[in-house]
Every structure is written in structure tokens, then in C-alpha cells.
Amino acid sequence: CTLALYAEGDLCGRHEIVARAHNRHILGMLSAILGGRALADAVDIIACGIGPGSFTGLRVAVSVAQGLAWSQDMPVHGFCSLEAQAHTAGHQGLLREGDRVLSAIDAQIDQFYGLWGDWRGGAFATDGEAFVCAPEGLLAESSCPATIVIGSGARYQERMPSDLISTARSLPDVTPDARVMAEL
């Protein structure tokens, strides 16, 4: 579960691994981040991950974002979880200039959600659309093999076609972080 507030150059946020417990943590995390301030005084726009990812986690995130936005007459902006994950890895210093990135999230059904892209100039540039596939069914969006596989879907790397990932570094513990997305 990850939340962030970016206001007037100040960033505060929380990022906690709470598998299957987002609904019990998200509002408490929001309250802690607001620190007693009214939502309307602290926020101009609400953004949330819109997938792909855990169906329940996405429902919680989108429901809370929509409910808060509706109650305060604020706009909502959605962002791709796979892009957020890649930006997080890059801003944590885990990606190198020119890395060919496969951002992957375990779909929990012997498949993964994936998105190809490149790390250039301090940003993740996507190459194609997000997809879901079995590890053995992975197709390259270009002729360039991955130099790094990030996210929980990296656990399938041994089953992915070797011509696409054989020399790729693996970072399975990277997850999207709202603090990074708030700064973008």
C-alpha cells in the first residue's frame, strides 16, 4: 500500500507491504500523511494506480480515490502500475541509462502482467502496451532483449524465453511507490 502527498515542493508519503490488507490500512495511512490538515486544503488532484495488478487492491485504490475526489470535487488521474514500478526502480538508482526494462507484476495465475520500455534521461519510456502472458509466451516488443526484469513477475524469469532475458538482471522486490509518482 503506497500513498503520497506532494504540496508546494514538500513530499510526504508512506509505502508499506501489506498483502491483502490495503482496505484496512489505506485510510489510516492517508490520515497520517495529512497530519490533521483537511483534504481540501492539502490536495488539488488525486492520482491512483489503475492496474494492472491485484484486482482487490485496485478496487480499493480506485474506490478510495473516486470517493475522496467526488466528496471534494477534485479531479482524479490514473497511472499504470507497471510504469510506476519502473519509475520507482529508476529513482531508487536501480536502473542504468539505456537499460531495456521488462516491468512485470505476478498475476497470480501462473502468468504475469508486463510492459517493455527503456530507461532514458531519468525517465521510463514505454515501448508498446501492457500485456498479460505466461512466462513461456513472452514476446519482445522489439529486437532488443531485456537488460533488467523488475517487479514480482521477475520470479518467472527462468521460464521466459532465454533469447529475451538470458543476461538480464532481476529485481523481484521492486514495487510501485506513490512517492516517486507524486514527484513526476
Question: Where are the regions that the model predicts?
Answer:
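Short glycine-aspartate micro-motif
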Residues: 43-49, 57, 100-104
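Surface "functional belts" at beta-alpha junctions
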Residues: 10-11, 15-21, 75-176
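N-terminal beta-alpha supersecondary unit
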Residues: 1-52
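Short, charged, surface-exposed secondary-structure boundary motifs
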Residues: 23-24, 176-183
